[in-house]
Amino acid sequence: MATISFSERDLMRGKNVTPAWYRVKIETVGEAPAKASEKGPSTNYPVEGTILFNGDTGDTAFKGVPLDWNFNSKAIGFAVGFLAAFGVEVKAGTRFDLKSAEGREIDIFVENDTWQGRLVNRVNHKYRAVRPEVTAVAAA
């Protein structure tokens, strides 16, 4: 018998959010070779985070929704805003450990997009520092 089970996180993965700024906890940052391309070898830096609450209103309606996105060594400039949101001053020639973001919180604008014919949540590299005056407010 092919028996499977789902975690709460698995079930939340398919939940579409209303486009907005969300407070997100960075769960993991990885590193893996990207698929071969005509541009040559590159490295992906996959990031997984979890929505905590709306970054403007504190609403927790989408609490627990996981988000996945990538940085790539061929377009690493997209990581500048990510690092800046943590207060890092990004300078040419300086090395940064993306993994140091694990466990930290950031505000991310989450959009909706269509991928392979279905609606998905999309992180399009819009980041800002956490606004400490905004805290979680339980959904009514």
Region locations from a protein language model:
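Short beta-rich binding modules
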Residues: 1-140
